[in-house]
C-alpha cells in the first residue's frame, strides 16, 4: 500500500501556484490532466456500463396490445400526474382547475421573495419555506392518493 504525500502548504512556490488558481485535488495532484483524462472517463464508462447492464438484464415490459373496443371504466394517467388529474377532476369549472394548476408554480416562485430576509441554510431556521414545503408535500400526497379512488371517495380518501 503506497503512502500519498500531502502537499506542503508552507512552500512559497506551491502557494503562488494556488494563488494563480491552478486546480489541485486535496492531495496536491493537478486536476489537468489526471482528473479530466483518467478519472472522468472511467466514471462515464462505468455509468454507461451500469445503464447497459440494467437494460439488458431487466428489459422493459411492453404490456398488452391496445384494444379500442375494451376500454377501462375510468382512464387514469401515469402516477406522477395523479395530483394534477385530481385537481382537474375535483373542481367543477375547467378554467378554475387550470388556474389552480397554474397557481402552484407561481406560489413556489413567490416563496423566496416572502422569506428573503432570512439567509440561513438550516431549514429549521426558515419557517416559511419549511411550512410551505411540508404543506405542499402533504397536499400532493393527498391529491395523488385520492386520484386513484372513485370521485365520491377521492377528497376524503374513503375515511369519512
Curated annotation (Swiss-Prot):
Q: Enumerate the PANTHER family for this protein.
A: CYTOCHROME B (PTHR19271:SF40)
Gene (UniProt) = petD
Keyword Electron transport among record annotations: yes
The protein's role, per its UniProt record: Component of the cytochrome b6-f complex, which mediates electron transfer between photosystem II (PSII) and photosystem I (PSI), cyclic electron flow around PSI, and state transitions.
Lineage here is: Bacteria, Bacillati, Cyanobacteriota, Cyanophyceae, Nostocales
Name the domain of life this protein comes from: Bacteria
What's its membrane topology?
Multi-pass membrane protein
Please classify the protein's predominant subcellular localization into one broad category: membrane
Q: What is this protein called?
A: Cytochrome b6-f complex subunit 4
Any one GO molecular-function label of the UniProt entry: oxidoreductase activity
For this protein, the parts annotated as crossing the membrane are 36-56, 95-115, 131-151
Name its GO BP terms in alphabetical order.
photosynthetic electron transport chain
Compartment(s) of residence: Cellular thylakoid membrane
Oligomeric state and interaction partners are given as: The 4 large subunits of the cytochrome b6-f complex are cytochrome b6, subunit IV (17 kDa polypeptide, PetD), cytochrome f and the Rieske protein, while the 4 small subunits are PetG, PetL, PetM and PetN. The complex functions as a dimer.
Q: Which family does it belong to?
A: Belongs to the cytochrome b family. PetD subfamily.
HAMAP family attached to this UniProt entry = Cytb6_f_subIV
A cellular component annotation (GO) from this entry: plasma membrane-derived thylakoid membrane
Q: Keywords, A to Z?
A: Electron transport, Membrane, Photosynthesis, Thylakoid, Transmembrane, Transmembrane helix, Transport
Amino acid at each position: 500500500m503506497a503512502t500519498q504525500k500531502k502537499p506542503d502548504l508552507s512552500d512559497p512556490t506551491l502557494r503562488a501556484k494556488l494563488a494563480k488558481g491552478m486546480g489541485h485535488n486535496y492531495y496536491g495532484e493537478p486536476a489537468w490532466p489526471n482528473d479530466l483524462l483518467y478519472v472522468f472517463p472511467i466514471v462515464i464508462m462505468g455509468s454507461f456500463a451500469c445503464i447497459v447492464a440494467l437494460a439488458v438484464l431487466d428489459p422493459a415490459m411492453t404490456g398488452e396490445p391496445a384494444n379500442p373496443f375494451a376500454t377501462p371504466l375510468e382512464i387514469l394517467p401515469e402516477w406522477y400526474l395523479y395530483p394534477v388529474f385530481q385537481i382537474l377532476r375535483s373542481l367543477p369549472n375547467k378554467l378554475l382547475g387550470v388556474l389552480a394548476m397554474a397557481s402552484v408554480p407561481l406560489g413556489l416562485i413567490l416563496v423566496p421573495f416572502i422569506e428573503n430576509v432570512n439567509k440561513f441554510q438550516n431549514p429549521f431556521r426558515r419557517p416559511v419555506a419549511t411550512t410551505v414545503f411540508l404543506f405542499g408535500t402533504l397536499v400532493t400526497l393527498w391529491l395523488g392518493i385520492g386520484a386513484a379512488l372513485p370521485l365520491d371517495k377521492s377528497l376524503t380518501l374513503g375515511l369519512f
